[in-house]
Each structure stands twice: as C-alpha cells, then as structure tokens.
Swiss-Prot record:
It is an enzyme of class 2 (transferase). Auto-ubiquitinated. Pathway: Protein modification; protein ubiquitination. Signal peptide: none annotated. Its EC number is 2.3.2.27. Residues 285-310 are annotated as: Disordered. Residues 276-306 form a coiled coil. This is E3 ubiquitin-protein ligase AIP2. Interacts with ABI3 (via C-terminus). The keyword Zinc-finger applies.
C-alpha cells in the first residue's frame, strides 16, 4: 500500500498528539517545532474533524497566543505563531473564535512590525534569546548602575575626607547624588511591584455584562430552602426574584453584585475568579499557573524517583 492510501490517524490519536504538543509549548527549545507541528495537523485534519476536535484545535492555538504574549517574545517564535493564526482564522467558522484569531493575527503583525521598525543598530545585538554575541553589550541592569554609582560616590567621599574638599570633588559629589536619586526613583516602583502578588483588578466589564440572569422559581426555592438569601444584602429570596449567576453557580441580586464586581474579580462566597481587563494581571496569573504546574511536576518526579542521584 502506498503512502497516499494509508489511513488517516484516528481522532483519538490526534487529540493525544495535540495534548502532547500543547505541553511541549512550555519548553522553549521545543516551542517553534511544536507550533509547526500544530500548524501541519490543523491544515491536514481540521476540515474533516468533529466539533470536539475542532474545539481542541482552537484551544491549542489560543494557548500558543498566550505563551507568545507572556513568555517567548523572540521574532522567530512570532513568525511561526502568525502563520498558525492565519491558517486557523481561515479554517474556523465560529464567529467568536474567528474574532479572537483575527486579534491574534493583528497582534503578531504588530509585534513583527515593531521589530522591523527598530533602528538598524539594534539588530546587531542578539540573534535570538540566549545567543552570545561579540557585538555591543546590552544595557546594564539598573541595580548594577546604582552599585557602580555608590562605589564612585564612596571613592570621592573617601578622597574628600583625607585631602579636604575641592571645587571639582564637590561638583562630582553633587552630580553623583543626583544620579543616585534618579536611579532610586526608577528602582523603587519595581521593588514595590515585586513585593508580592498584584492587587486583583475588577472583573472584565464584558464578562459581567454577559453573566446570565435567572428567575428564582418555586423549584429553586424547594432546592435551596426557605432560608435562601442573597449573601450580599442578606435578604431572603422570594419567587420571582431576578438573580445573576456566576460561573461557580452562586447567585446574587444583580444590583447587589454589580458594585462588588466593580471593585473585585471574584465570587463573594467561594472567591472563584472572573477574567479581568488588566492584561498585566492576567499575564501574572498565567505565569503563576505555569509555575505551579512546574512545581507539581517536579514534586511528582521526585516522588517517582525520576531525579534520584547516586
């Protein structure tokens, strides 16, 4: 039998392969090859796939977009991502999926356009992340700049104490002091930001607007009991009350829930989080989730004896 007549892989095996490729996206050295493999599978099998497999394709492609935005920003990665997003946008028919993929395409093009528009000098640095080059060195981190300024300041002050101040040393000292102050203004906000998890912003306005509203019926009254109440206003629920339902299935009066979600992004009862409009916070959550998965993987590996040394 020739290759052209060989049977196509079953949907089950395709799902397993997509699962494995999605995991490979977390490994930087495997990212680009994984994206290319996902692209090939999408091109060859999406049109004949079942709705559930099509959904899995969409989830994996969306994961590629998330990883590009939050972790791997090298130009080559974005080029591979753009090709995948364009193929996916061409194939999908669901309106919301197509809209999201269009935004992924636009963001990839914007990212690559920014790289193209950078001054020629900047292209003489690193060919890719981690590459060692003999061209100009990257800028020093701010902490090292401050350390060098402190050393210079201490040297000048030491010279003044032994030889007495001169007009030149007084001027140099004043200049160094000003540079130190300016540098601290740049460092302190970063220190404060890194001191712990960021404060959770309000829930996304679009998500809140789409929360379903249900009517409290006699059947629900029997289910929850006569003492059922809105936990925000503490009023007992009565038949006919309009209730807004969160993804965690907890319900509240819409006028009670709105002020809460204007300031928080979580359920008042179980703290299940809703998406927010703050991309920086969403990126932080994504990194925390990945870090937690890596910690669990390491713990499981140690328990399983994968990293035992003799």
């Amino acid at each position: 039998m020739d290759a052209s007549s060989s049977p196509s892989p079953s949907e089950e095996s395709l799902k397993l392969e997509l699962d494995d490729l999605q995991k490979q996206l977390n490994k930087k050295l495997r990212f680009e090859a994984s994206v290319c493999s996902i692209h090939n599978l999408l091109r060859d099998h999406y049109s004949s796939s079942s709705p559930s497999l099509r959904k899995q394709f969409y989830i994996v492609v969306s994961r590629v977009a998330t990883v590009l935005k939050t972790r791997y920003t090298a130009t080559g990665f974005w080029v591979a991502g753009l090709s995948l997003f364009e193929e996916a946008e061409r194939l999908v028919s669901d309106a919301s999926e197509k809209k999201h993929l269009k935004s992924c395409v636009a963001q990839a093009k914007e990212q690559l356009s920014e790289v193209d528009n950078q001054p020629t000098e900047s292209s003489q640095g690193y060919l890719f992340e981690g590459h060692l080059t003999v061209d100009r060195e990257p800028p020093q981190p701010q902490w090292l700049v401050q350390q060098n300024l402190m050393s210079a300041f201490a040297s000048i002050v030491g010279g003044e104490s032994s030889n007495g101040p001169t007009e030149n040393t007084i001027g140099e000292t004043a200049n160094l002091m000003q540079e130190l102050i300016n540098g601290l203004d740049m460092i302190i906000p970063d220190i404060l930001d890194d001191g712990g998890p960021p404060r959770a912003p309000p829930a996304s306005k679009e998500v809140v607007e789409k929360l379903p509203v249900i009517i409290f019926t006699e059947e629900l009254l029997k289910k929850f009991g006569a003492e059922a109440e809105c936990c925000i206003c503490k009023e007992n629920l009565v038949i006919g009350d309009k209730m807004q339902e969160l993804p965690c299935k907890h319900t509240f009066h819409p006028p009670c829930l709105k002020p809460w979600l204007d300031e928080h992004n979580s359920c008042p009862i179980c703290r299940h989080e809703l998406p927010t409009d703050d991309q920086k916070y969403e990126n932080w959550k994504e990194r925390e989730k990945e870090a937690e998965e890596e910690r669990k993987g390491a713990e499981n590996a140690v328990r399983g004896g994968e990293y035992m040394y003799v």
